Amino acid sequence: WTIMAGFRLYLACLRLCCACRFDLAGLDRLRGAGPLIVAANHPSLLDVVLIASRLPDAVCVIKAALFDRLLFGAAARLAGYIRNDAPLEMVLQARAELRDGAQLVIFPEGSRTAVFPVDAFAPGAALIAWRAAMPVQTVLIDYSSPYLGKAWPLFRRPALPLTCHVRLGRRFPPPADYAVFSSELEAYFRAELGQNTPSTATIGS
């Protein structure tokens, strides 16, 4: 709850000071839904904050490098987040968290999107779903700008207001074959996001 409250406060500051608009109501439908895997696309640095701000039982799988950052790393360890650099340990920790009732948030691309709509998926999300026998709830994140994406210069301001819409997609049952499911999951995201990707033309404007 402490992490969720902190993320909500941060988003409130972005709304107030930076004219950002976030439509996150769809995520509220997952509260109380019990343990499951939340698989989302990853266009921006804000994605973890957006999802975890609405889900009190969220445990996120994040890049190992983030644990080395002073403030975020401390918060990640406090929240019990999982590093993605040791596949076997990641799967075992994720399965244990799910069995304890957590909602596991994972970005199957493994890092922020470089080539929209999504980069190739790593097998981690599918492998966890298979080993833990858990359903996978897809979450689709759309921004009005590629701000804080991989291609966006860190100190370049976006056009305001920045808007973000987070919607629930299909919920997949526990997979019988993780390799087949990983391909199916990637194809689903490509189909759903293909017409709703932020234009990189705004980067040079």
Residue ranges and their predicted role:
Residues L71-G73, R99-Q103, A114-E184:
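A cross-family acyltransferase "interaction/gating" segment
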Residues P35-I37, G101-F107:
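Residue-level preference for the first positions of well-ordered beta-strands
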Residues W1-G6, L16-C17, G32-A86:
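Catalytic core of membrane glycerolipid acyltransferases/transacylases, capturing the structured
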